[in-house]
């Protein structure tokens, strides 16, 4: 870790600084007067349930230094993901499954060797991770929801828990490939999170460390003025440039 990254972490202790680079040069771009319910609540069953659900402040800021967008009002550990069923999404949709198959095939054909150790953070129902079972028998998934359908996937070593940096204490084999889909936007300290992956990953034969990340595109949100995409569930709103800044700062 370089000196600048250490300074960044110290600066981020100030809640008014950027959560990636630590800069205090930030500006609010979206701060509605009304508080928002969590988007994961979906539709409530009754009118009274809708009125009584918890609501949260949303103050989206942009960092002038690294260009990252984030919710300044987000409180760490304010959302629990361990008490809900995972809706990994469209398991019975042919189009969605075809899309997942194409994505997995691209990863297998271009990045993986036989018997690589694959780790997925926030693996949901395990459908995507299971698509690599024809390439390796070492598939490890972390998913905090105890109601995940992943328990039915015998090909996967499942941990019904949040992923923590002490992963190496529980596994003899270091991962060769890490997958994280629609997780990073929920993480309150993304730089430390990505640095953890860099330190635990094995290098491939090209001396590369491989990390696959999917996040919602804030570029599309900004291009279409779609401010409904700003809600409390997401700490971060990544653009291509801010995500690149993050993973480069972490050592990749």
Give the role of each language-model region.
Residues 88-90, 114, 227-229:
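A short, structure-level motif marking secondary-structure boundaries and short turns
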Residues 46-52, 226-240:
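Acceptor-substrate binding/catalytic loop of class I
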Residues 2, 14-92:
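N-terminal juxtadomain amphipathic helix
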Residues 88-103:
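Conserved SAM-binding loop and adjacent beta-strand
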Residues 26, 104-225, 235-252:
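Conserved SAM-binding loop
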Residues 52-60, 97, 187, 237:
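Short, solvent-exposed loop/helix junctions and linker helices
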Residues 91-92, 184, 230-234:
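The substrate-binding groove and active-site-proximal loops of carbohydrate-active enzymes
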Residues 9-10:
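Long, intrinsically disordered low-complexity tandem-repeat segments
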């Amino acid at each position: 870790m370089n000196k600048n990254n250490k300074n960044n972490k110290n600066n981020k202790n100030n809640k008014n600084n950027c959560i990636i680079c630590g800069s205090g040069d930030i500006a609010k771009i979206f701060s509605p007067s009304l508080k928002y319910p969590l988007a994961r609540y979906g539709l409530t069953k009754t009118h009274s349930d809708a009125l009584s659900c918890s609501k949260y402040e949303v103050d989206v800021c942009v960092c002038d230094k690294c260009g990252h967008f984030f919710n300044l009002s987000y409180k760490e550990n304010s959302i629990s993901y361990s008490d809900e069923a995972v809706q990994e999404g469209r398991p019975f949709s042919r189009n969605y499954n075809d899309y997942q198959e194409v994505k997995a095939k691209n990863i297998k054909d271009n990045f993986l060797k036989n018997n690589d150790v694959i780790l997925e953070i926030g693996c949901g129902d395990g459908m995507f991770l299971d698509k690599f079972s024809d390439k390796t028998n070492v598939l490890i998934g972390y998913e905090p929801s105890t109601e995940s359908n992943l328990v039915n996937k015998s090909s996967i070593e499942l941990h019904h828990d949040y992923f923590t940096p002490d992963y190496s204490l529980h596994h003899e084999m270091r991962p060769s490939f890490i997958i994280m889909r629609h997780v990073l936007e929920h993480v309150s300290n993304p730089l430390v999170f990505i640095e953890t992956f860099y330190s635990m990953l094995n290098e491939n034969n090209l001396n590369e460390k491989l990390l696959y990340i999917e996040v919602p595109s804030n570029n599309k949100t900004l291009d279409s003025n779609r401010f409904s995409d700003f809600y409390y569930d997401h700490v971060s709103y990544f653009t291509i440039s801010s995500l690149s800044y993050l993973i480069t700062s972490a050592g990749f």
